[in-house]
């Protein structure tokens, strides 16, 4: 089995990487820099997001394993002091995996050009210069005319990230679908939006048709683009749906999702 390592640049992550490589070599495991079958990320959820996009063209052939060297992460099952246990699990690996849905995003520009993206956590669109105005279509039917700061579209596993910060619901990661959450929507006697998150099923398509040409900021996980109208080219439409691809994690032990939610956001219950 070919094992790759993807770490951040902190001193602790560098130390853990060195220890892991030493223990893997001692156990007879193969470390590779290209074409891995298992990728071990060392850092936090941000590091795993970066690794996901680094290897996104080969997702069907890779299983991820996360070691967190800082705060508790939702994608990182192992702590830095559990290297020996992880190496033992790698030696006994039988291909066991758990997978989660991803989000496909298609951006259409006024010149007809189309750009495709894939998100593990979320995509957001907002206008930083004025109220964002867009028409929201669900399965090609106009649902509402949105006015506000922006919109957040997230996966089930991404529902605990930025989506939660803007008032979205936390969704069981075993669900297949995606969620739309509003960012500071404008509601008064003239303009109205639904004012609550929407959770879509596996076959739904969400389309956002933008009315303004300038000032939009588009994100896909950790990547961000400031979009400006240049020579008649500007963003006109975004479409979202559940991706045909999935992300796979090596499942060496069971870590209860709802226990992580409780530990991260609630703490001890008295």
From Swiss-Prot:
SUPFAM superfamilies: NAD kinase/diacylglycerol kinase-like
Reactions accelerated catalytically: NAD(+) + ATP = ADP + NADP(+) + H(+)
Enzyme class: transferase
InterPro entries: ATP-NAD_kinase_N, ATP-NAD_kinase_PpnK-typ_C, NAD/diacylglycerol_kinase_sf, NADK
Example GO BP: NAD metabolic process
A GO term from the CC aspect: cytoplasm
Principal localisation: cytoplasm
Active site: 45 (proton acceptor)
Cofactor(s) the protein needs: a divalent metal cation
GO molecular function: ATP binding; metal ion binding; NAD binding; NAD+ kinase activity
Protein family according to the UniProt entry: Belongs to the NAD kinase family.
Protein name according to UniProt: NAD kinase
């Amino acid at each position: 089995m070919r094992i790759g390592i993807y770490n951040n640049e902190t001193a602790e992550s560098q130390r853990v990487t060195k220890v892991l490589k030493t223990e893997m070599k001692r156990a007879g495991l193969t470390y590779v820099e290209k074409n891995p079958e298992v990728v071990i990320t060392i850092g936090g959820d941000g590091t795993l997001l970066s690794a996901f996009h680094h290897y996104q063209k080969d997702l069907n052939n890779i299983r991820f394993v996360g070691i967190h060297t800082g705060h508790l992460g939702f994608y990182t099952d192992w702590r830095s002091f559990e290297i020996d246990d992880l190496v033992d699990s790698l030696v006994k690996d039988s291909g066991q995996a758990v997978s989660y849905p991803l989000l496909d995003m298609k951006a259409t520009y006024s010149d007809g050009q189309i750009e495709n993206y894939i998100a593990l956590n979320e995509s957001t669109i907002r206008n930083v210069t004025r109220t964002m105005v867009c028409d929201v279509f669900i399965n090609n039917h106009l649902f509402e005319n949105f006015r506000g700061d922006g919109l957040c579209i997230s996966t089930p596993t991404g529902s605990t990230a930025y989506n939660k910060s803007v008032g979205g619901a936390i969704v069981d990661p075993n669900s297949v679908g995606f969620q739309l959450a509003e960012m500071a929507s404008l509601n008064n006697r003239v303009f109205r939006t639904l004012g609550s998150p929407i959770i879509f099923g596996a076959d739904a398509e969400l389309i956002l048709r933008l009315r303004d040409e300038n000032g939009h900021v588009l994100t896909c996980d950790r990547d961000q683009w400031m979009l400006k109208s240049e020579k008649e080219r500007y963003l006109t439409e975004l479409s979202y749906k559940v991706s045909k691809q999935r992300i796979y994690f090596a499942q060496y032990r069971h870590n209860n999702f709802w226990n992580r939610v409780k530990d991260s956001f609630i703490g001890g219950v008295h």
